[in-house]
Regions:
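A residue-level marker of the well-folded mature domains of exported/periplasmic proteins
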Residues: 13, 18-25, 44-313
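Basic, mixed-charge low-complexity alpha-helical segments
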Residues: 35-36, 46
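Sec-dependent N-terminal signal peptides
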Residues: 24-34
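C-terminal motif of bacterial Sec signal peptides marking the signal peptidase cleavage site
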Residues: 39-42
Length: 313
């Protein structure tokens, strides 16, 4: 690798790490808003203020790497907050296993168990009605996070909140990294036609975040002066194993015409890398792969020059 190439990877790595630090701030903000909401709702400033808070959390899939890392950060933050305030923070975490009906039952159980606040990483962002109705009936605040519900639903009751990154920002930064890579590394233009031929590994069919991330990633590349051509796409449901299968199918269909893999999250980007490794191609023959989330494993893949970048979520 020439000196210029080494510098490019070092600079991109630094940029990625800066963006990851920003995502850590989002997690801390989530914890701060969560604890503050509970304090305002039930503990703040009264002589009879409770000395403990019970928080129920339901995640759409505990095996999603980003969600798993976010929950670890949140628990670490809660421990720190306990030490600062002297208020015991008890957290019960549930895995909805990608089932909205399961998640609805979990929320009902949280209410029965006496949770002071409920946090929900929605399975189906278009179907929060049962959760909202249960919470409103029992006057328990709900903080939705990471998977944004429809705005009209969020406005149904004053004790509903949402915390999460803006999907378009992640898409813009992903597009910036991809454009920078293409414009500074001629080897990525494998057929030499001056066009970045790409495929997309999309999170979920019709999911707002997936659609917005892809749209802004592509439009940002174009705005940066990169001519692009979409070869194909596949739905991989944010899942690494599904992404490996879908990437293998895309490779079978488009072969070495693929110059860029745009993945809506790091797990799917890593699934694409798994498929590339299984294909027997050398790294020099791989298309560029880029993700979103800034997960630990995603950053490790950037460090190992398997991914050209990842951005915060």
């Amino acid at each position: 690798m020439c000196g210029a190439e080494k510098v490019r990877h070092m600079l991109m790595g630094e940029q990625v790490l800066k963006k990851w630090k920003k995502s850590k701030k989002m997690t801390v903000a989530f914890g701060g808003i969560l604890v503050m909401s509970v304090v305002i709702g039930g503990c703040g400033g009264r002589e009879d203020a409770k000395k403990s808070i019970k928080i129920g959390i339901s995640v759409y899939d505990q095996y999603d790497t980003f969600v798993s890392e976010m929950m670890k950060d949140f628990n670490d933050y809660a421990t720190k907050k306990e030490e600062e305030t002297g208020v015991a923070i008890n957290i019960d975490t549930y895995n909805a296993s990608a089932s909205q009906s399961t998640q609805n039952s979990q929320v009902e159980n949280m209410i029965t168990e006496g949770c002071d606040v409920i946090c929900v990483n929605l399975v189906d962002r278009t179907d929060p009605t049962a959760i909202i109705d249960l919470a409103e009936k029992n006057n328990i605040p709900v903080i939705f996070f990471n998977r944004e519900l429809v705005e009209e639903d969020l406005e149904r009751w004053t004790r509903l909140y949402y915390v999460g990154a803006q999907a378009f920002e992640s898409g813009i930064m992903q597009g910036e990294l991809a454009a920078e890579a293409f414009l500074t590394d001629q080897s990525l233009d494998k057929n030499g036609d001056g066009i970045f031929q790409y495929v997309v590994l999309e999170g979920e069919a019709g999911h707002q975040d997936a659609i917005v991330r892809t749209e802004y990633s592509v439009s940002t590349m174009i705005d940066s002066g990169v001519e692009v051509e979409k070869l194909g796409y596949a739905i991989a449901n944010w899942n690494r194993a599904q992404a490996q299968t879908k990437m293998a199918q895309l490779m079978s269909q488009f072969g070495d015409s693929i110059e860029l893999v745009i993945a809506n999250n790091d797990d799917m980007a890593l699934g694409a890398i798994d498929a590339l490794k299984a294909s027997g191609l050398t790294k020099d023959e791989w298309p560029a792969v880029i993700g979103i989330d800034g997960t630990d494993v995603g950053l490790e893949a950037v460090k190992n020059k398997e991914m050209i970048g990842t951005v915060y979520n």
